[in-house]
Amino acid sequence: MPRVKRGVTARARHKKVLALAKGFRGRRGNVFRIAKEAVMKAGQYAYRDRRNKKRVFRRLWIARINAASRSFGLTYSQFANGLKKAGIEIDRKVLSDMAIHDSAAFGAIVEQAKAKLVA
């Protein structure tokens, strides 16, 4: 069986890992063995936070809608209930954006929700 020289593949693998570790501080960015662990950990953080990002944004949208709807005299839960009864299906992202950039339109939606709560 012929001898296999692995210098080329090892060099490529090291180069790939060190490229992914570019910008890391200290030996995490330039020593292969440590950089490999740092890159793996960074990947775990990235995987976790891609999922957390969705939760964080939803919480932000709800906080913004709550603040805006309170200025019109409704809590978030009352507002959400009114929207459901009124048959208005606008998602939280759009409602949050409307509350910030188009408060008149948001106010009109709040009034519709209020009307359905009373009726």
From Swiss-Prot:
NCBIfam families: rplT_bact. GO terms for molecular function: rRNA binding; structural constituent of ribosome. Transmembrane segments: none annotated. GO terms for biological process: ribosomal large subunit assembly; translation. Keywords: Ribonucleoprotein, Ribosomal protein, RNA-binding, rRNA-binding. It comes from the Bacteria. InterPro entries: Ribosomal_bL20 (IPR005813), RIBOSOMAL_L20_CS (IPR049946), Ribosomal_protein_bL20_C (IPR035566). The gene is rplT. This is Large ribosomal subunit protein bL20. Gene3D superfamilies: 6.10.160.10, Ribosomal protein L20 (1.10.1900.20). Pfam families: Ribosomal_L20. One of its GO terms (cellular component) is ribonucleoprotein complex. Belongs to the bacterial ribosomal protein bL20 family. Binds directly to 23S ribosomal RNA and is necessary for the in vitro assembly process of the 50S ribosomal subunit. It is not involved in the protein synthesizing functions of that subunit. It comes from Polaromonas naphthalenivorans (strain CJ2).
